[in-house]
Swiss-Prot record:
This protein's name: Proline--tRNA ligase
Major location category of this protein: cytoplasm
GO MF terms, alphabetically ordered: ATP binding; proline-tRNA ligase activity
Keyword Cell wall biogenesis/degradation found: no
Compartments it resides in: Cytoplasm
Keywords: Aminoacyl-tRNA synthetase, ATP-binding, Cytoplasm, Ligase, Nucleotide-binding, Protein biosynthesis
CC per GO annotation: cytosol
Domain of life: Bacteria
Length: 442
């Protein structure tokens, strides 16, 4: 993409309404625009990052055996009355009526609807286990939306729902998603720690939040430093191997870790003082096992191997991709702007043409652009006629992992300068060497 043709509305000043780093940088770098309280439009560069996050989530959900579907945003109130949550959910739920005066709602979550889909088609235990997921926009009417997309009213959510014949099967479904989440966050470039959590309005008897440590986190969290050194499950993880999954979950739940609501001072005192980490944290995922909480009132049953009907055991598993984008910024930035992990960076590299209109600079910039594009690097070419300082500031602000600087002096010497955004290190390379280095990273 050429910057001269790209919609990138950079803000020079810090927005007054932005309270935290991610909100400020997302507005300044032209990722989002606020349309009303807690509701945002995603602009081109923000949407690219969001889509990359969703791609990683999809790949890991599919790897774990989940099936993608797409449920509507508008749901019937009748389904929620079946589960008993229509009146219990509170004012966060946006209730509406259609022209026939039928009561509807803008879905804040999808347990009822997915249970209705399940009971309409699945009759036998032979069709289990089953895990259905979708990525869809949701709405919760927060009393005080703040922190940009970190706590917005409309947000993108990946929610998965598992169905099993019995508790043991449901536990393994929970373990599969637990391990899948560890891999997902690591691939996005975040170190997430699973912590026992309250089940809240979702209900159930087992729940973990996945927390990343960040100074601007909403919650106080406590964990053993051992988590910081645990190896994330690799690409060779076999999601059909119950023993392997159980071993991974055991390793990731044995050291102490708890949110403020679940914190136990007596257990905390057993952690060596030098291993105690007390910090702020951001929730990036939440998983629940809730047994027959929804299948019982909604009649979701299957015929078991004994010929009798059995209520299915269920779980739900959520990741907020839009929130995850903000969390990645909170975890990786500096005074100049965002520092994107490579996996979710909007572009693989930025090419900075220091002197557009100069034959040499234009020629080298085009050569780099073509070579990197053909290699799948997806570069952003800054071909705008602006002063060098403005070009550097833009590249640092939007946080591309690598910058390739093309200037008249370097071109005369057959070289370009390559800058690593994270470390700030610069090196001069001949043009072919720069192309080889960047294409090797694609």
């Amino acid at each position: 993409m050429r910057l001269s043709r790209y919609f990138l509305p950079i803000l020079k000043e810090n927005p007054k309404e932005a309270e935290i780093v991610s909100h400020r940088l997302m507005l300044r770098s032209g990722m989002i625009r606020q349309q009303s309280a807690g509701i945002y439009s995603w602009l081109p560069i923000g949407l690219k990052v969001l889509n990359k996050v969703c791609t990683i989530i999809r790949e890991e959900q599919n790897r774990a055996g989940a099936n993608e579907i797409l449920m509507p945003t508008i749901q019937s109130a009748d389904l929620w009355r079946e589960s008993g949550r229509y009146d219990a959910y509170g004012k966060e739920m946006l209730r509406i009526q259609d022209r026939q005066e039928r009561e509807m709602l803008f879905g804040p979550t999808n347990e009822e609807m997915v249970t209705d889909i399940f009971r309409s088609y699945v009759r036998s235990y032979k069709d289990l286990p089953l895990n259905l997921y979708h990525i869809q926009w949701k709405f919760r009417d927060e009393v005080r939306p703040r922190f940009g997309v970190m706590r917005s009213r409309e947000f993108l959510m990946k929610d998965a729902y598992s169905f099993d014949l019995d508790y043991e099967g449901a536990k393994m479904a929970y373990y599969r998603m637990f391990v899948s989440y560890l891999r997902t966050f690591a691939r996005v470039g975040l170190q997430a720690i699973p912590m026992r959590a309250d089940t809240g309005p979702i209900g159930g008897d087992l729940s973990h939040e996945f927390i990343i440590l960040a100074e601007t986190g909403e919650s106080q969290v406590y964990c053993d430093r051992a988590y910081l050194d645990l190896a994330v499950p690799g690409a060779d993880t076999d999601f059909r191997n119950d023993a392997q999954l159980t071993d991974i979950v055991t390793r990731w739940t044995t050291p102490y870790a708890a949110t403020d609501e679940m914190h136990d001072e007596a257990d905390w005192a057993k952690v060596k003082p030098e291993s105690q980490v007390s910090a702020r944290g951001i929730e990036v995922g939440h998983i629940f096992h809730f047994g027959t909480k929804y299948s019982e009132p909604m009649g979701a049953k299957v015929q078991g191997p004994d010929g009798k009907e059995h209520l299915v055991f269920m779980g739900s598993y959520g990741i907020g991709p839009s929130r995850l984008v903000a969390a990645a910024i909170e975890a990786s930035h500096d005074d100049a702007g965002i520092i994107w992990p490579k996996a979710i960076a909007p572009f693989g590299a930025g090419i900075v043409n220091m002197k557009p209109g100069d034959e040499g600079c234009d020629g080298v910039s085009e050569k780099l652009y073509e070579a990197l594009t053909n290699a799948g690097v997806d570069p952003l070419l800054d071909d705008k006629d602006e002063r060098p300082g403005a070009k550097f500031a833009t590249m640092d602000l939007i946080g591309l992992p690598t910058q390739v600087i093309v200037g008249p002096r370097g071109v005369a010497a057959g070289e370009v300068e390559v800058k690593d955004r994270k470390t700030g290190e610069r090196q001069s390379l001949d043009i072919e060497a720069a192309i080889n280095m960047l294409t090797a990273q694609a």
